[in-house]
Amino acid sequence: MDLSPRVRAVCDLDVSEVREYAGRHEYDGKPQDLSPAGVRAGLARLAAARADGDQLADTHDEAHLSAAEVQKRVAYAELELHRRNPILHLGELDLACYDRDYAPREERDAARAEHIAAWPRVADAAVGSLDQVSAPAYQRSCGPVVSSR
């Protein structure tokens, strides 16, 4: 089932969760680009889809979709969580979804290999994005902060 542009734009800003928990296997092997440029592009697609898209006929569904759009804007544009929360980047490295028997082994293995091949890009995006991690979080994971003063 194809997704409407608005739903697709929301899903594109939550790739690891959508792949793992919604079973959207078109995202297999394709980690989300959480670099600053990648997030800006995703937010631009979200805004364009919202501006160009029709409201859903069902008011309940429309309310859920609108709330999801707001959540993505708050998470990525206002709070910039991709710049301060390493877990978002770690989620893009997760390969566990390929362990389930949702498709033939060969298809899952190919998706896993494609996903692993993208790891350098995911790591580069994390390095380029994570410039607002709090010092206590950094110290717990990496050791003491060295000051140049």
Regions inferred by a protein language model and the residue ranges of each:
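N-terminal maturation segment of proteins
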Residues: 1-149
